[in-house]
Swiss-Prot record:
Cyclic nucleotide phosphodiesterase with specificity for the second messengers cAMP and cGMP, which are key regulators of many important physiological processes. Also has activity toward cUMP. Independently of its catalytic activity it is part of an E2/17beta-estradiol-induced pro-apoptotic signaling pathway. E2 stabilizes the PDE3A/SLFN12 complex in the cytosol, promoting the dephosphorylation of SLFN12 and activating its pro-apoptotic ribosomal RNA/rRNA ribonuclease activity. This is cGMP-inhibited 3',5'-cyclic phosphodiesterase 3A. It is linked to Hypertension and brachydactyly syndrome: A syndrome characterized by brachydactyly type E, severe salt-independent but age-dependent hypertension, an increased fibroblast growth rate, neurovascular contact at the rostral-ventrolateral medulla, and altered baroreflex blood pressure regulation. It results in death from stroke before age 50 years when untreated. Brachydactyly type E is characterized by shortening of the fingers mainly in the metacarpals and metatarsals. The active site is at H752 (proton donor). It comes from Homo sapiens. The gene is PDE3A.
Amino acid sequence: MAVPGDAARVRDKPVHSGVSQAPTAGRDCHHRADPASPRDSGCRGCWGDLVLQPLRSSRKLSSALCAGSLSFLLALLVRLVRGEVGCDLEQCKEAAAAEEEEAAPGAEGGVFPGPRGGAPGGGARLSPWLQPSALLFSLLCAFFWMGLYLLRAGVRLPLAVALLAACCGGEALVQIGLGVGEDHLLSLPAAGVVLSCLAAATWLVLRLRLGVLMIALTSAVRTVSLISLERFKVAWRPYLAYLAGVLGILLARYVEQILPQSAEAAPREHLGSQLIAGTKEDIPVFKRRRRSSSVVSAEMSGCSSKSHRRTSLPCIPREQLMGHSEWDHKRGPRGSQSSGTSITVDIAVMGEAHGLITDLLADPSLPPNVCTSLRAVSNLLSTQLTFQAIHKPRVNPVTSLSENYTCSDSEESSEKDKLAIPKRLRRSLPPGLLRRVSSTWTTTTSATGLPTLEPAPVRRDRSTSIKLQEAPSSSPDSWNNPVMMTLTKSRSFTSSYAISAANHVKAKKQSRPGALAKISPLSSPCSSPLQGTPASSLVSKISAVQFPESADTTAKQSLGSHRALTYTQSAPDLSPQILTPPVICSSCGRPYSQGNPADEPLERSGVATRTPSRTDDTAQVTSDYETNNNSDSSDIVQNEDETECLREPLRKASACSTYAPETMMFLDKPILAPEPLVMDNLDSIMEQLNTWNFPIFDLVENIGRKCGRILSQVSYRLFEDMGLFEAFKIPIREFMNYFHALEIGYRDIPYHNRIHATDVLHAVWYLTTQPIPGLSTVINDHGSTSDSDSDSGFTHGHMGYVFSKTYNVTDDKYGCLSGNIPALELMALYVAAAMHDYDHPGRTNAFLVATSAPQAVLYNDRSVLENHHAAAAWNLFMSRPEYNFLINLDHVEFKHFRFLVIEAILATDLKKHFDFVAKFNGKVNDDVGIDWTNENDRLLVCQMCIKLADINGPAKCKELHLQWTDGIVNEFYEQGDEEASLGLPISPFMDRSAPQLANLQESFISHIVGPLCNSYDSAGLMPGKWVEDSDESGDTDDPEEEEEEAPAPNEEETCENNESPKKKTFKRRKIYCQITQHLLQNHKMWKKVIEEEQRLAGIENQSLDQTPQSHSSEQIQAIKEEEEEKGKPRGEEIPTQKPDQ
């Protein structure tokens, strides 16, 4: 009996025995055949299969054979037409006589006089139909190659045939509609009408380069057919040529199907319609393998048939680039074998790279950020060049959990002194550069998942820490632990790689019945997010107790360092006596077993909390997104969440002591959107979506407050309006399922609820789709660009541009953000808006940090809520296949989309508000301004957009603004009550006994919303409309005065930054912006309220009124200066505002 490994080797290695007559074919047949295939037994006896198998397997051989055969047939026909092939003399004479008799009365319907028949030189002796047949075959060949080119460029077969149908329509219009005679079909008007019809169809279907080629070919074919097909009527000749073209395209489609596809070509059915043009920028695509010339050659010489890549370079594992089943089939049992060869670093190559970077640094035209990045790489290379070559054996991928192996850069090891940066170099480098040097290659530092330097402080040590703790084999869930993990060198090891390796193993084990996927905030799968996710698992949010409204209820709730996550597991390899289900901590995501109930029980309000004891731990990987906004405190990971799990005494100020957290439970059925998926009684309100003051609270009343479907309904309408369902082939049911589960996960709290998420989603949609005066777009005519996007890694629908159906402005004086932001990035912005406050507890980041909440410990006190929102929302997305509405995105697109969503959510942290505003102001005031072809600039614009949408309440009309103000104040008061019950100092504006509503809103507008709107407006990105001269003369009083204060100077700055000189003619024109008008009006309203309160307080006690009055007058003066000089940079105001934050 053959061993499976031997069978696999027989499949992969050439077979030298078997069929003696055709050894090559037999070898290929054995190589490609499936052992279980029924063809395997009969392939030896089928001589035709043995001969054709090499042709089918080799793309070059099949293409060469096809081209050669067609060329031979064409040459043969041409020679027959010219009479160069011998024929019977009597037949030639008979053909000549018949030709003379037929030519005597004249050709009916002919265009040019003269004899019919073949070409000069003996062609008349042949059959009179041979020349037309040869000509039609030539036209068929021409369209064959053109059709093959179109199909391989991504054009579908019906669209290609539709182009020729458009030509037929043009011919019918010329001959029947316009009444052009047969003698004038070659005239310029007739040809112009036909080619115009073809050009119109081409403009909608093809890119510019393909369209020009199609028009040129069709024009030439039409002319040749009208001149040369003399055996047919003139009116029939173009249709015969088009018929030959259809046959040629059909033949091309058939040939394309039988020829093997290239590895880089995407499936034709996934390209979609080409109605949306693509972008100009080149999108990098993952290659299957990267090699270093000298290193790989040395490796191959030392280990014969085994080839290795340089593990010092980052690489995406193959199992992420293809399905697990395909990867397992390709690698076979050999994938688990370990090679003990060493990895060498070529010092000469590093020296050459250092020299190239030094030459680049000598260029004075490089931007400062590029120079800084290159200087960082140069310093790293120069440091490594002082050391000898590093030899480090590869780690055996089969790692036993009982070995307690550790591979963390932040811990002591024998190789750390060689790999880490010397302390003398760390002291000599500036902090910003040091953070860049220590960064890791992950999705945080690269939007597309490729290795690029990111100026954000991403620390390598935090993202590369992996620990495999010792676990007894008798653990109840030991079968669920990853037992095989491929580890690369620590310098290139990332969290995304570690998790993907673990998930690859877990996917195999969890494919068995009863296996459940473990959801953890730390996991971030890189490949298809739902591979390996069983159908029996679900993450469901169930709120045990809502936030209390008084201190009495908060004092009665239970304590717990872990939020227990219990579920039942079943596995085939579990022993029957194990009945205790494992418990998962929902804060850190790791399983732990419950200890003895008698061991130090903590009882409060009748609830006993047992101290957990850790028995098992899977690979721990800290998320890269935790370090986006970090300070320069330390490069060593602190496992505070692990310490929190083992901590027995609970502090009084713990967040768990104040409220019962939501429990995540694994259920048998997912949360699915109810029927009907789209509610049909909301059309009257949904028609107002294109207004800034959308009546969202009226929509809540119509839907029903207890229904909770507002987010999914509005999301569907906005996605459908933008055409995103068609552009990305989004399945509607999965889309509605996820967004319904997402809105259910929002808690019923006063402000940060599903209504707020819907309002933010509507705001970002409005800011990106409505007309913006003076904004130039990178595309024209709604999606038509140049033909320079054919090398892009994405299809047109994915990297093209989408427009709202409500955007019907044809004036080039207006533009919109959706014309500058690709569709994938725009959809990521919308999804981020829907996710951005998911599972918000109704407390601020400062409160969670002060009370040492589990989330604060998990995310190291940095952007705690924002990290939690993103992690929880993505965990929900990856928990069920019913939620995967991004199923048609490939690996690179999904990684890019996930990166954009997370970055947009993290940007909503108000602690980083002034940093974003200052960075954006610097970009706007730069000579170049916003470069829409730069992905980083577009990301910054999207971050500013979602920040403005998140705090858009003061920019709404008075009625909506007061409703939102009531919600945030009530939520603040609940936090103040809890702080008082815990003995903590009450945060400003959160004391229910001393309300300061007017001061809160006035300060928030003056210091937060005002500067943000000012920066956004100064960049020329605020929707509005030009104020015509007639409107200016008709306006009086307030509107015009307010417009003179703010938008007029702003338009000067906008026009100066525009590249087009035409915009300078509108330098003096005014812009009416509804958003800024509401902001100014609401600010004036709160100032009047403050003045009235001060006046009433002054009547009672004049002496106590002096200090607050002077302080308020300073704030009022500051906002007046802002209104009058809105176009000026606000750099001098920011330092005075930060202390107020």
